[in-house]
């Protein structure tokens, strides 16, 4: 009988790979604890599995889970620099925003409401998307909390058009 190390909200540390293989207990970013809210956290991971606004092909909705799965390999410490980010920061994975496929405006509202809650609880939201459209809900939440913001959007291709297939 093997007793697996349980994720602890008291330490906000991912479990040691020597106590539980990295392919076990997958689902949370960096194998961090899951939390119901962002109270007491410095940062909160929030998935936004939405791709209804993608003009080419669907699939970005699988981004948050894909990122979470591969993030199991990330170590919170930098051996060369002797720094463990989790010694200084408290973070957890809050799961996914309750998006509504095919309903863009309702999903914008869900993103805005979720991230407004995270910001009001004092944490910095780190979003895992999702298509480009999720940014609008994120910016609305940030604007509510902090006022005017600027956005620099880096992408691998120039696809931010004013109209696509005759639609604005």
Q: What would you call each of these model-derived segments?
A:
Residues 1-8:
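Short, Lys/Arg-enriched N-terminal segments with co-localized hydrophobic residues
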